[in-house]
């Protein structure tokens, strides 16, 4: 399947307690809500909509009772056939979600029936989840028991032409080479920790470290793209980045299937969203002009389907000025750089939102000067003319 950004997903509202995974008056995965997200996806050129909480099993303590999950039976207010038909009419796909609560045997018993159903309705990607420290209340995720289970899921998905985004996985070991439908996986302290973690969220140096650690093991679904940092549920917890750094993470943290993590109302009418909608996920070439573990990272990637380049440059809690030579560009071409930078007085602690958007004619001799705020970053689109 073609790699692409799906749109924002029906899940961040649950973390903010505006919606629920389980049934009730605030249930997020409804037909109406999903169709609104599909409209948003079609409007902005996204390829899919990921929905969590659509299926039976979320009521009660689902993490402790994962064997209650059904992966084929939808809640009454989620019309799978209507939604997938509507999505197809808009050129969008529904992305499946299979949270197991760690109940591996229950999931394996339903794999063929579930994936056959999804194939029938044009669902060609599934995000899996295992929110429980043990599989079937007895085995660690990284045990032989767990490895065999994860591999069975990937192999079964391949039979039905379904790609997998695996959350709570085992340590990546290059299985994508054998199973190319394993598009990406979590296996990292991702953006969701910025919604509820008791320690306040990921510190600024986290994202300048993981490209050198977890990033070396394979694609990671970090789920960057948060635009609203206000957290009424856990006021002390929020992304310890600027908004410009959230944009830059889309390039720095590689995943061939990216997930824009925020709610659609936080994206609408924000000019910074243009970078999210323009940034590809399939790259022909990657260069790293500068990087120092835990301090700063600048990564430039060339789009596989065009002659355009995208750059993400990020810093830790220290402000930084980056001199970036564009010598990796075609020496015989001219380009237009669209620069999304930290605005005046921006900082990750109490003023994360200012973003300055500028344009500049550039070529392979250009050296860009990028000023980055504490916890900040710069995202750049370089379009060949």
Predicted regions and their residues:
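Solvent-exposed beta-strand/loop surfaces of large extracellular or lumenal domains
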Residues: 339-365
